[in-house]
Design a protein with these regions (language model features):
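Detector for outer-membrane/organellar transmembrane beta-barrel domains
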Residues: 186-306
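Sequence/structural signature of outer-membrane beta-barrel proteins
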Residues: 44-48, 71, 85-90, 118-122, ...
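Outer-membrane beta-barrel "beta-signal"
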Residues: 223, 313-317, 338-350
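Transmembrane beta-barrel outer-membrane domains
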Residues: 55-59, 94-101, 146-148, 172-176, ...
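Outer membrane beta-barrel
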Residues: 23-46, 53-180, 184, 222-223, ...
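Repeated loop/turn-to-beta-strand initiation elements of outer-membrane beta-barrel proteins
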Residues: 73-76, 110-113, 159-164, 189-194, ...
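Outer-membrane beta-barrel biogenesis signature
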Residues: 8-13, 19-36, 121-123, 138-141, ...
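Membrane-embedded beta-strands of outer-membrane beta-barrel proteins
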Residues: 62-66, 104, 153-155, 181, ...
Length: 350
């Protein structure tokens, strides 16, 4: 029972974004309004395989959230809204940052409804290593794509490690929501999450938008060993490219979802995996190494992998300074080119 409580608490922590400490603004009776978020400044040195090297800086990942909690008939009701500054983002040269809605949901007991993380995210996120890369954090998992990580409408029911999710479908021709069922547990120093995804996936190209049932299964694990932890995940299925981030036509972008998972009118299977290691060197210094890969069983045998390693130093409470190296075997987004990158960042949480 204690292990189930730990798993449920870990997931609840992520959905409430409590990795960013909240500051209580107002408390009146049983109602509390708080503010949280972080400010992140990053500089990225890029060395693409097919282009000239460059350097770009950004603070777009910075975010702010407001949370209201109250008791109604002995039930805790939570409302949460959060935004960052990726509203007009098409690359580092996108111009003046614009506010973007990340989360807007309400939660009562075991039910959460609104715009928030999808079911695939919860199936892997608690078992991942810590990454600095805003795009590509979960590559190699069924939640590798950040494009559809937070559907406009999501319904979660979570209780004692079990989670059922119905979310706004990616396919415009879907007859039902995309659905995810998962179960999480922690046994001593080992934790796992097993999940199944079902969705109406497009099989056509351009105007031929017929759909078929796409099914996928995933397993994510974490093994704690002293001051370190081993992380691993694997998934396989058909119709999963819109969530993994890799399509039969290459890296996912919002314009190719209709043909993402199909070839010659048929859904194509794909398999992905990731392995990682996290180590806490001192109370202030920690590091992570990770490898993620996705392979598609299409005519071109499409495959992409990403390698990364980082060090993060807690300079002051709530103030982290970090550096991360990463290497992509192919382009994953127009602004995430094939080749190497080094990111240097500072992040203050409040």
């Amino acid at each position: 029972m204690n292990n189930l409580k730990k798993a449920t608490l870990a997931l609840a922590t992520i959905v409430a974004c409590t990795n960013t400490q909240a500051i209580d603004l107002v408390t009146k009776g049983d109602t509390t309004l708080s503010v949280g978020g972080y400010i992140k400044a990053e500089g990225v040195f890029s060395s693409p395989d097919d282009k000239d090297s460059d350097f770009e800086g950004s603070t777009r990942e910075s975010r702010i959230n407001f949370k209201a909690t109250t008791l109604v008939s002995d039930k805790k009701v939570t409302g949460f809204i959060e935004g960052d500054f990726y509203g007009n983002y098409t690359g580092y040269d996108s111009g003046t940052p614009e506010l973007r809605l990340r989360h807007a949901y309400l939660q009562v007991d075991h039910v959460t409804v609104g715009k928030t993380w999808n079911g695939q995210f919860f199936a892997v996120a608690p078992r991942l290593t810590e990454q600095l890369d805003f795009y590509g954090t979960g590559f190699g998992t069924i939640a590798g794509s950040g494009i559809y990580a937070r559907p406009d409408l999501t319904l979660h029911y979570a209780n004692k490690g079990f989670r059922f999710t119905a979310q706004d479908p990616i396919s415009d021709d879907a007859n039902l929501p995309d659905m995810v069922v998962s179960y999480s547990d922690d046994i001593s120093n080992f934790g796992y999450t097993l999940a199944a995804t079902a969705r109406d996936a497009n099989t056509g190209i351009n105007d031929d938008l017929d759909t078929e049932l796409g099914l996928g299964v995933s397993l994510a694990t974490k093994l704690t060993l002293g001051k370190g932890s081993l992380h691993g995940s694997i998934y396989t299925g058909e119709g999963m490219g819109v969530y993994s981030g890799l399509c039969t036509t290459g890296a996912l972008n919002p314009g190719n979802t209709a043909s993402c998972d199909a070839e010659n009118g048929e859904l194509i299977s794909q398999t992905g995996f990731s392995v990682g290691y996290r180590h806490v060197f001192t109370p202030k210094l920690r590091g992570n190494m990770r490898y993620g890969e996705v392979n598609i069983d299409n005519e071109a045998d499409t495959s992409i992998n990403i390698k990364s390693a980082n060090l993060i130093y807690t300079y002051l409470p709530d103030l982290d300074i970090g550096v991360e190296w990463r290497d992509r075997s192919d382009t994953t987004l127009p602004w995430r080119q094939k080749g190497q990158e080094v990111e240097i960042m500072a992040k203050y949480k409040f």
